[in-house]
Amino acid sequence: MKNESREFEVELELKARVATRDIDDIMCTALEGGITGWCRAAKPVGKRLGEYGHEQIARGGSLVLYDAESSDKWELTLNKFLRGLALAIESGVSVTIDAESGYIDTSDVDGECADMIIRYALFGELIFG
């Protein structure tokens, strides 16, 4: 038998865990530069649930994000954020998941990655880029 190179594909079901601090980290990264190319402002809906705006989502609140070039606006909720995170991971966005604990490692989430998570959350796809 020859030494031939073959490739095999396996299908995986992946579960990732995300803690409040992880959501806060991703939201902070997004709001401080990740989404600023297309989003001019973010405002909490109702009562502010944390000390900072980026803490709103993980605590069950929502943020209204305002388009940089039009009057369009979108509401980001925890459910949308989690859906966006899942879509981003499924689409190959570079998010590291610890094999033992299942928690995501936010130290790898830069502005571009955070931006993609938020765009998947709001639009279900990557628009604006």
Feature names for model-found ranges:
Residues 66-80, 128:
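Short, surface-exposed beta-strand/loop "edge" segments at domain boundaries and coil↔beta transitions
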Residues 106-128:
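Short, compact, well-ordered microdomains
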Residues 1-68:
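Long, contiguous N-terminal structural blocks used for assembly/anchoring
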Residues 95-110:
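A short, flexible low-complexity segment enriched in Lys/Arg and Gly/Pro that occurs
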